[in-house]
Amino acid sequence: MKNFISLLIAIGLTLIGITASAESNWVTDYEKARVAAKVGKKLMLLDFTGSDWCGWCMKLDKEVFSTPEFQNYASRNLILVKLDFPRKRPQTEALKNQNEQLAQKYGIQGFPTIIVLNSQGEKVGELGYTDGGPSPFLAKLETLPKS
């Protein structure tokens, strides 16, 4: 029984680590991300989401963004920016204002909406939920101009 409990604890800690590492690739500060994209010559992926209430957003996170395939691709090619509109999770006023201004700038009307910018900050694509896991989503990203 003691070994079983130890095993459950180890599995739980591993899962927490996987979730934390997937989340750690996302930033919330748009300006810092913009500079990083420019310096790194990477695309910027803006994820407009309702993380704690939007079913399609949660599905996109689970089926695409949290997968090793997407994480590996993103680490080489993307600066990931989470622009969240939660209903239950608290946010600072500065973060709320930033997210609302960006949603207005890009004409966001529903969630999830993914806006892709090139390293110069120009919009090169717009995506939503894509069925089939990370491969079809990454295939769509690959068709977008890089500069």
Short names for language-model regions:
Residues G17-S21:
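N-terminal signal peptide c-region/cleavage motif recognized by signal peptidases
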Residues W56-Y73:
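Typically the conserved alpha-helix immediately C-terminal to a functionally engaged Cys/Sec
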Residues W26-M44, A74:
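A short beta-strand-turn-helix
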Residues M1-L8:
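Bacterial N-terminal signal peptides that target proteins for export
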Residues C54-C57, I114:
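The canonical Cys-X-X-Cys-His
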Residues L8-I16:
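Bacterial N-terminal signal peptides
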Residues K41-C54:
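Short active-site neighborhood of thiol/selenol oxidoreductases, capturing the structured segment around
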Residues E63, Q101-S147:
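Non-catalytic, surface beta->alpha helical segment in thiol-disulfide oxidoreductase systems
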